[in-house]
Amino acid sequence: PGTGSARVDTGEPFLDHMLVTLARYAGLDLDVQARGDLRHHLIEDVGIVVGAAVAALAPATAVRYGDRTIPMDDALVHVSIDVGGRPYYEGPLPSGLYDHWMRSFADHARATLHVRVIRGRDRHHVVEAAFKALGLALRDALAESGAVFSTKGSASVRVEP
């Protein structure tokens, strides 16, 4: 979907770093300019809009699934994602703010997202490994497959007054 370039300015340096990392590993182009009244709201809102952007990008014929495990020094984090339209998040990350970012992202990307911290002492390393793993898993999940990966078919509803 892009080249992995990012222009990010949220006023929150670690969030900026995570978004640049996500863009690079996912191969997505991100341009994020954001400010918030509270740090919590800012991080949540950015998760919401990045998730919504990913939902808009996901083709009906996407592979849908991505699964990556990333080591970063003391940290080892596994991420599995399905961009098939069923929002669900299973964590947690050791940082409540970035755990909430992942939940907000998953809800608005309409993705099932599992983030499993296998080990790690340094919260920075754990969160960064999670964003790297998410990026690589997204790159795989958003790839074009040429077919719709679903056995459910479709349903339609007609409502008359």
Describe each model-derived feature in a short phrase.
Residues 1-161:
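Polyanion-binding surfaces on beta-sheet-dominated domains and ring/shell assemblies
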